[in-house]
């Protein structure tokens, strides 16, 4: 494939063109008065979106070089999304502003490498400043504010996420499902929940709701397939004497053993239910061990030299309550805090050590199941298009609240970055010189871009608003939805520090790369050759 090679100013200008196109498409969504973007889908209805990274992923340009610019800026958005889960539009607007400002200097003959060094130093200074200004999230009101701002000023959603976090803890899982009704609802399960239900419907204790509910049961946890009922008899006899129900969690229970359990259950001899173990392979064993720790029992496995037929009552787990439906099992246990805490710390260490994002996600799920329970938000909407938009907004809101809990909150609405601009200029003048100083000043000038854009989307003059904000104290800024200057914390317009920091770092990193570009190599589009004129009657329009 032949290549096109473009050098110097031409290369940078071509990248800039692509960056302009993407930044403009994404920037229209910024702020409380930001508009939506409609995306055409190859199949199904068009999607109406207000989420920066989703829009960025859809944009592909015909010109290969301009498309390279789009791909670079898209990276700033998706990296921010990966790190903080929100702030993608801010990252795009910032990167665009730094590139525009920087290219002017490079065109005027500045040394791009020194500019990059200045940009990097400025970014490090700003990250420290953001950390020092961040306030820890103390109460559910702050969490609700962060969630509401991220979901596009939907305070009902913010409150719902705050309630969910209250119930499942800061590390609990909040998952999203498409609901069946018009309203968005929150469903919380306390304790540990995994997605395997009873093996046979005959185990249901409540036939109307088709669920099995046991109070104060014993739990037999094993990674074996149970084929012979003789293996179970010693345990069943001990449990029957104790007069408490039994829940068996095993890899599988085969026909003969299952039939015996069902018959005993129906005759009222023994209150019992059997559930298949969750997960697969090594992960299954780890999850069974988690359940054993949670319930204060032992995993009966031949790896540890333990056999079913010699199992004693004190090796079984105990729970306050177990609810089993056809699809999932919820265990509410208590009294094993020390063991659970040790197990949680162990999983946390594994999360830190693992490189794979898939493993990280699965470990995070295990951590959440152990440490807090699960909240499910069922997203409701009138149409599928609205449902998809709400789901994306909710996802942003959940990510933003988790980020806020991690690193605290700062004034929102572009205010923090705008206030840091004069501080950066002051610091840079005192500590940097020459073109490094110019690099830091490029960042300082770009910092007001998100605030300007929020004001412009609200129909006002961005430059005037940003100058006014710079004169105010740090906690005060511009409330675009009510068109007034307010204390951002009091008004509840806050951003997670992690989101602001990630957006800034990723924007500066990508922009610095664009400024130091001196040559672009892209594929040359191949002209399609038409068939020769005499290629059969009426066949000349086909490509060969």
Curated annotation (Swiss-Prot):
| Protein keywords | ATP-binding, Chaperone, Cytoplasm, Isomerase, Nucleotide-binding
Q: Where does ATP bind?
A: 29-32, 86-90, 413, 495
Which processes are annotated in GO (biological process)?
protein refolding
GO cellular component annotations of the record:
cytoplasm
Please name the InterPro entries in this protein's record.
Chaperonin_Cpn60_CS, Cpn60/GroEL, Cpn60/GroEL/TCP-1, GroEL-like_apical_dom_sf, GROEL-like_equatorial_sf, TCP-1-like_intermed_sf
Give a yes or no for keyword Ubl conjugation in this entry: no
- Highest rank taxon of the organism: Bacteria
Q: Name one GO molecular function term.
A: ATP-dependent protein folding chaperone
Places the protein is found:
Cytoplasm
Q: Which reaction does it catalyse?
A: ATP + H2O + a folded polypeptide = ADP + phosphate + an unfolded polypeptide
- Its main subcellular localisation, reduced to a broad class, is cytoplasm
Pfam families for the chain: Cpn60_TCP1
Q: Which SUPFAM superfamilies match?
A: GroEL apical domain-like, GroEL equatorial domain-like
Query: What Enzyme Commission number(s) apply to this enzyme?
Result: 5.6.1.7
Tell me how this protein assembles. Answer: Forms a cylinder of 14 subunits composed of two heptameric rings stacked back-to-back. Interacts with the co-chaperonin GroES.
Classification via NCBIfam families? GroEL, PRK00013.1, PRK12849.1, PRK12850.1, PRK12851.1
What does this gene product do?
Together with its co-chaperonin GroES, plays an essential role in assisting protein folding. The GroEL-GroES system forms a nano-cage that allows encapsulation of the non-native substrate proteins and provides a physical environment optimized to promote and accelerate protein folding.
For this chain, the family text in UniProt reads:
Belongs to the chaperonin (HSP60) family.
Q: What protein name applies here?
A: Chaperonin GroEL
Q: What lineage is this protein's organism placed in?
A: Bacteria, Bacillati, Cyanobacteriota, Cyanophyceae, Synechococcales
């Amino acid at each position: 494939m032949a290549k096109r090679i473009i050098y110097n100013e031409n290369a940078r200008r071509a990248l800039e063109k692509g960056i302009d196109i993407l930044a403009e498409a994404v920037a229209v969504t910024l702020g409380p008065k930001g508009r939506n973007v409609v995306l055409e889908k190859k199949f199904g209805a068009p999607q109406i979106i207000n989420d920066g990274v989703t829009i960025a992923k859809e944009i592909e340009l015909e010109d290969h070089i301009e498309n390279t610019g789009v791909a670079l800026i898209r990276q700033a958005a998706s990296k921010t999304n990966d790190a903080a889960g929100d702030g993608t539009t801010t990252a795009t607007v910032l990167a665009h502003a730094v590139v525009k400002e920087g290219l002017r200097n490079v065109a005027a003959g500045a040394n791009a490498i020194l500019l990059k060094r200045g940009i990097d130093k400025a970014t490090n200074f700003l990250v420290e400043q953001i950390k020092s200004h961040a306030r820890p999230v103390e109460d559910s009101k702050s969490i609700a504010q962060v969630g509401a701002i991220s979901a596009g000023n939907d305070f009902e959603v913010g409150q719902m996420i705050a309630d969910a976090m209250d119930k499942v803890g800061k590390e609990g899982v909040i998952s999203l499902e498409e609901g069946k009704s018009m309203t968005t609802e929150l469903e919380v399960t306390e304790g540990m929940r995994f997605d395997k239900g009873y093996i046979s419907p005959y185990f249901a204790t409540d036939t109307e709701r088709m669920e099995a509910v046991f109070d104060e049961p014993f739990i037999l946890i094993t990674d074996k397939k149970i084929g012979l009922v003789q293996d179970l008899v010693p345990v069943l006899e001990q449990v029957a004497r104790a007069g408490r129900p039994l829940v068996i969690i095993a890899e599988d229970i085969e026909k003969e053993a299952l039939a015996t359990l069902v018959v005993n259950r129906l005759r009222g001899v023994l209150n019992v239910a059997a559930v298949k173990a969750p997960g697969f392979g090594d992960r299954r064993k780890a999850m069974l061990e988690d359940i054993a720790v949670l319930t204060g029992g032992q995993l009966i496995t031949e790896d540890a030299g333990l056999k079913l037929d010699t199992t004693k009552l004190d090796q079984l787990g105990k729970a306050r309550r177990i609810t089993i439906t056809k699809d999932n099992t919820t265990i509410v246990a208590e009294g094993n805090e020390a063991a659970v805490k040790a197990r949680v710390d162990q999983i946390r260490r594994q999360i830190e050590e693992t490189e794979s994002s898939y493993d990280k996600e699965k470990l995070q799920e295990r951590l959440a199941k152990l440490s807090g329970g699960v909240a499910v938000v069922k997203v409701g909407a009138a149409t599928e298009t609205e449902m998809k938009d709400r789901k994306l907004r909710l996802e942003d809101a959940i990510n933003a609240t988790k980020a806020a809990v991690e690193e605290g909150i700062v004034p929102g609405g572009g205010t923090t970055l705008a206030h840091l601009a004069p501080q950066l200029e002051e610091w840079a003048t005192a500590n940097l010189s020459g073109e490094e100083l110019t690099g830091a000043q490029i960042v300082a000038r770009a910092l007001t871009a998100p605030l300007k854009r929020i004001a412009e989307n609200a129909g006002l003059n961005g430059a005037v608003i940003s100058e006014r904000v710079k004169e105010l104290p740090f906690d005060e800024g511009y409330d675009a939805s009510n068109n007034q200057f307010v204390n951002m914390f009091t008004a509840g317009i806050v951003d997670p520090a992690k989101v602001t920091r990630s957006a800034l770092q990723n924007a500066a990193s990508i922009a610095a790369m664009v400024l130091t570009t001196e040559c672009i190599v892209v594929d040359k589009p191949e002209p399609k050759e038409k068939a020769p004129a005499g290629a059969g009657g009426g066949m000349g329009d086909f490509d060969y």
